[in-house]
Design a protein with these regions (language model features):
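N-terminal low-hydrophobic presequence detector
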Residues: 1, 31-32
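Intrinsically disordered, low-complexity regulatory regions enriched in serine/threonine/proline
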Residues: 2-9, 13-20, 25-27, 51-53, ...
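Ser/Thr-rich, low-complexity intrinsically disordered terminal regions
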Residues: 26, 33-69
């Protein structure tokens, strides 16, 4: 899995969060779509949510899942203005955790037990 974030701010916590989750087994296409994933590009399920950011540019959080293998391809925080990874501060991290928690509640993701 690729993780896209600028290496400052809360980047380490964001990476730890990404590494602590995985897809639940046997998720149907319908479940992905009900949880907010799209597949306009047929081989990929794509989850994207805008984040409220103090910068004047829009920032998004996204997860890409390969439809055939049901594996997470990438997770990232993207500056939509420049289409580049963005840094994660406390506010963004809280919003990302909220989105991840909702996907856990939907049964799409689960936390890896250590």
């Amino acid at each position: 899995m690729n993780i896209y974030v600028l290496p400052r701010g809360k980047a380490d916590e964001f990476k730890s969060l990404c590494e602590s989750i995985r897809l639940r087994p046997n998720i149907t296409d319908k479940q992905f779509k009900e949880a907010g994933f799209t597949n306009y590009y047929e081989p990929i399920f794509y989850f994207c949510k805008g984040l409220a950011c103090e910068d004047k540019y829009p920032v998004s959080f996204d997860i890409q899942v390969v439809k055939k293998t049901r594996k997470i391809k990438s997770i990232g925080v993207l500056d939509e203005q420049f289409l580049q990874p963005h840094y994660v501060d406390e506010s963004l991290l809280d919003q990302i955790k909220s989105h991840v928690h909702k996907l856990v509640e939907y049964g799409i993701l689960e936390y890896i037990k250590e």
